[in-house]
Amino acid sequence: MCYSAIGEAAAKAAMSAFERVIWAVLDSVGIGALPDAADYGDAGRNTLGHVAESRPLALPNLVRLGLANIEPLAHLAPPARPAGAFGKAATHSPGKDTTTGHWEMAGVWLDRAFPVYPHGFPREVIAEFERQIGRKTLGNKPASGTEIIKELGDEHVRTGFPIVYTSGDSVFQIAAHEDIVSVAELYRMCEIARKLLDGPHRVGRVIARPFNGPSGAYARTPRRHDYAVDPPRPMLLDVLKDRGISVFGIGKIHDIYNGRGVGQYATTMSNADGMQKLHGALRERPSGLIFSNLVDFDMLYGHRKDIEGFARSLEEFDRLLGDFLQQLRDADLLMITADHGCDPDPRWKTTDHSREYVPILAYAPALPGGVNLGVRATLADMGQTVAENFGGRIPHGQSFLRELSGAAGQVALGEGQVRHL
């Protein structure tokens, strides 16, 4: 294609809406500490930066889109003109969890963080939960999910008492061996907990954590299920639903928004399964929003401080991304981002999420790329971009839809400042 044809295609795409937006959230793949990270005990944490320092990474597709143009990443050379637009965004809301991040992407700012329980849940909460499920519980403390089933798994198998635990995030997690407590019964317990945990104890998520295996080799199974709460205000998925725009959720998306605004959805067993379902959605869904969360980075590697596993998972995603990019049409927009960080660097002993910027990569085959989106003041800028594309608007955020053509230049945010990287 000649240069004039490229320019004509870019101008046309900038003037008309993309028929389809594919939004992929790489759960916990942050890109450096936010200015207020010290308030969360996260000064110096940098998920992508530290994984890149751990060894050379093979990420040719992410680098081609502009990942290494956002921040310097060890062993990764930024292209002079990446194929995509690139930037990073701050989380405006207090907190550093999945719900806060995804809600903000959709235009919901929280005034206060979801409650956390560094010393376990209040005795009255646990007592009422035990009364309603008809059995005692074990644990009730912050813990790594893999470590607590090592510690208490045998006692759970012997007694049948479910293991209740939390973390540095706003979660009430219930672990049970599938041979001792059926998955259906575990889900019922989670539904009871979700109804119980309201008011001042309204945690962001109740999570079912089934596991199996013999003593000494317990392992979590993929039948995890999240029970969230409704977003408190109208948000992107409501706007799209009202406008008749289809929303297809992949992975945890349905659970994170408590089903609000999500039409059809597909759960996933792994990142590879999530990418396979994204491929299927490209074949079957010609328009609307395809919204996915790929959780392995967080669940399998970030919380477990497995920096090598995190590196391999990024490389796996990059390999799968290469073929995916070939399937995109001129009327498609792909956005790749994260919801928070979860730095696996062993120098930080905590296994909790980290308060970090998230990367933004935006790619459309019809656009020239190479656009610096700068540092965005809120994750809601991405949601506002999607909303504007489909003719709507959400309460917060500044759209960068027009910037993607490279013709609009840098704009000032209504609720903060954008600066060049």
Predicted regions, residues:
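Feature captures the catalytic ectodomains and active-site-proximal regions of enzymes
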Residues: 2-421
